[in-house]
From Swiss-Prot:
Name of this chain's protein: Bidirectional sugar transporter SWEET14
Keywords of the record: Cell membrane, Membrane, Repeat, Sugar transport, Transmembrane, Transmembrane helix, Transport
Any Gene Ontology CC annotation: plasma membrane
Region (Disordered): 266-290
Cytoplasmic-side positions: 31-44, 94-105, 155-167, 214-303
Keyword Zinc-finger among UniProt keywords: no
Species, as recorded: Oryza sativa subsp. indica (Rice)
Length: 303
């Protein structure tokens, strides 16, 4: 690391700043897991974002290990692996049996199966610089697919004319993170680090523009099933869009779920429900909505 700071002082500075920003983003879900711990329940939250974040961190550590002078990528993604593993462990402790089974299968499929296959193919079918090229494009492809996830949140903001699903502070911090890591990749002449962050910056600017456009608008009332349709997701355990969660934007999970659970608009019944019958259907709809919006967040870790 000392050699890097002497040869690329600006790259070291941007890499260090990127480490700080990304580390703070990793810690963003802490309030969510504090709620899970206090309530002894996962409350409809998904494990998908954390499994994908762990997979991304593993990929970038492997990539950094194949190169020289990539200590800054190793440090932040190592921290990410530890933090995401803790999140997943806590989730497994308090999740219902069905969610535990789904999370275990997802871990085996993605973090063991897919990562193991990538490791095996790059070691057996390529060597030297070619191995770095192959793995670099794998990392770029994964990062780009993850950055597509914010499209559902952007569409939801446009439909509802409400920015409560998209906090400005989060969009701003993620945009700054993309700029910092782009400059880091540019200065060390690593296109695999720089390229994905161009897309990340673009989505960040779009989100901040939408925030400026709709922050004073009167929100439209959106029913639970409309939110689900806008995010194009399924139930808690089988959300298709959840697989596209981003590594760095996982913080949106807590904010989006809090908003949906506290500000959901319910349909008005003509007849008042019996006092003794709790509105369990509404509770189920709220949980499904929370999972749907959580599955549409964006995240990309330290790259």
């Amino acid at each position: 690391m000392a050699g890097m700071s002497l040869q690329h002082p600006w790259a070291f500075a941007f890499g260090l700043l990127g480490n700080i920003i990304s580390f703070m983003t990793y810690l963003a879900p802490l309030p969510t897991f504090y709620r899970i711990y206090k309530s002894k329940s996962t409350q409809g939250f998904q494990s998908v974002p954390y499994v994908v974040a762990l997979f991304s961190a593993m990929l970038w550590i492997y990539y950094a290990l194949l190169k020289s002078d990539e200590c800054l990528l190793i440090t932040i993604n190592s921290a990410g692996c530890v933090i995401e593993t803790i999140y997943i462990a806590v989730y497994l402790v308090y999740a219902p049996k069905k969610a535990k089974m789904f999370t275990a299968k997802l871990l085996l499929l993605v973090n063991v199966g897919v990562f193991g296959l990538i490791l095996l193919l790059t070691l057996l079918l390529s060597a030297g610089d070619r191995r770095i090229v192959v793995l670099g494009w794998v990392c770029v492809g994964f990062s780009v697919s993850v950055f597509v996830a914010p499209l559902s949140i952007i569409r939801l903001v446009v439909r509802t004319k409400s920015v409560e699903f998209m906090p400005f502070s989060l969009s701003f911090s993620l945009t700054i993170s993309a700029v910092v890591w782009f400059l880091y990749g540019l200065l060390i002449k690593d296109k695999y680090v720089a390229l994905p962050n161009v897309l990340g910056f673009s989505f960040g600017v779009i989100q901040m523009g939408l925030y400026a456009m709709y922050r004073n608008s009167t929100p439209k009332a959106v029913l639970t099933k409309e939110v689900e349709a806008a995010t194009a997701t399924g139930d808690d355990d089988h959300s298709a869009a959840g697989v596209k969660e981003h590594v760095v934007n996982i913080a949106k999970l807590s904010a989006a779920v809090d908003v949906v659970k506290t500000r959901e608009v319910h349909p008005v019944d003509v007849e008042s429900p019996p006092a003794e019958a709790p509105p369990q259907e509404d509770d189920k709809a709220a949980a499904a909505t929370a999972a749907a919006v959580a599955g549409a967040g964006e995240k990309k870790v330290a790259a």
